[in-house]
Amino acid sequence: MESLTLQPIARVDGAINLPGSKSVSNRALLLAALACGKTVLTNLLDSDDVRHMLNALSALGINYTLSADRTRCDITGNGGPLRASGALELFLGNAGTAMRPLAAALCLGQNEIVLTGEPRMKERPIGHLVDSLRQGGANIDYQEQENYPPLRLRGGFTGGDIEVDGSVSSQFLTALLMTAPLAPEDTTIRVKGELVSKPYIDITLNLMKTFGVEITNHHYQQFVVKGGQQYHSPGRYLVEGDASSASYFLAAGAIKGGTVKVTGIGRKSMQGDIRFADVLEKMGATITWGDDFIACTRGELHAIDMDMNHIPDAAMTIATTALFAKGTTTLRNIYNWRVKETDRLFAMATELRKVGAEVEEGHDYIRITPPAKLQHADIGTYNDHRMAMCFSLVALSDTPVTILDPKCTAKTFPDYFEQLARMSTPA
């Protein structure tokens, strides 16, 4: 297996313009494909997940052109639901941001379409979304294991009264919200359980509004969507920088700054993961906010005990930042780590122990006490981009760290290690 050993880093300083947000990129691509008119998307993320969405749209007859660096996409909308010319199988890798929204959107047509992906995708639950779509008339079969992809879709979604479980993934609600305006009937969506990652729903609602569709939101517990609507291209749309990707650089600034400035997001960002900066501030770093940037300056870091349900992806970065904080850090209400690219609670606990930390892994929490001195270890990444990027922070000590399968960062940030090296002064 390929590996990358990062030597100890003495200081991190400088600025980085963030690649586009994965969450925003894939939502914007789907809405542009469903919309009337031509849309020009700029600062699109070039990564595996976005390529899976683009490949699927192409197979569904959507015409688009990409710039040489794949960050600008000119896409001609279908002016309504996506249609396949015949029976079709779409391979979506391990891209939840493609699988969930497409599973819903493709229930508007009449074609037979199979959605499948990598082995890990077949372990990521989708049953709650399928149950909700069936309540709206969709005809869906499981091809292998009940409640998991691959799925066979045969259209049939018309809207109506629908319940969705909000406790596993906000992507299920996102998928229903983006599909419902194109259904023939009005749709009322009721959310059962505690809605996880609520800020991601704000991204969805924000983008739908940009594409000309408004819905009624009753305190995130009930959404009313008029049927028979159309999305309309906004013309040009700039994709915000990825706030989850910003977390690694901001944390590096907190641990070994200097000052690190990330551009492409700021105080007006629609992504909930910008709140990661508030957590670093609580831990002792200094944060400066601009409209289009966030800067973090080193401080003496101390442990925190916090509910991280609102920023589950960025919270992973706090788990490795905790190695540099005084005291025991507890991250709570993070059960949905278990249904991501890998079981991130298990993976994080396992790898933190390798570098010497004392770790308590609960059903939905993790408690981390740093060692007096970090140990050099080979870090397993579980084909999970965030594990690789989180554990790069271990090199901000006087100990090297070896990252196994470093190319797994291609899911959201193909040149992550080059960018980190550019801003780092070796010890």
UniProtKB/Swiss-Prot annotation:
InterPro entries: Enolpyruvate_Tfrase_dom, Enolpyruvate_Tfrase_sf, EPSP_synthase, EPSP_synthase_CS, RNA3'P_cycl/enolpyr_Trfase_a/b. Its EC number is 2.5.1.19. Phosphoenolpyruvate binds at residues 22, 96, 124, 171, 344, 386, 411. It holds the Pfam family EPSP_synthase. Keywords: Amino-acid biosynthesis, Aromatic amino acid biosynthesis, Cytoplasm, Transferase. It catalyses: 3-phosphoshikimate + phosphoenolpyruvate = 5-O-(1-carboxyvinyl)-3-phosphoshikimate + phosphate. 3-phosphoshikimate binds at residues 22-23, 27, 169-171, 197, 313, 336, 340. GO terms for biological process: amino acid biosynthetic process; aromatic amino acid family biosynthetic process; chorismate biosynthetic process. Its main location: cytoplasm. The active site is at residue 313. GO terms for cellular component: cytoplasm. It is found in: Cytoplasm. Pathway: Metabolic intermediate biosynthesis; chorismate biosynthesis; chorismate from D-erythrose 4-phosphate and phosphoenolpyruvate: step 6/7. It comes from the Bacteria. Belongs to the EPSP synthase family. PANTHER family: AROM/DEHYDROQUINATE SYNTHASE, PENTAFUNCTIONAL AROM POLYPEPTIDE. Catalyzes the transfer of the enolpyruvyl moiety of phosphoenolpyruvate (PEP) to the 5-hydroxyl of shikimate-3-phosphate (S3P) to produce enolpyruvyl shikimate-3-phosphate and inorganic phosphate. This is 3-phosphoshikimate 1-carboxyvinyltransferase. The gene is aroA.
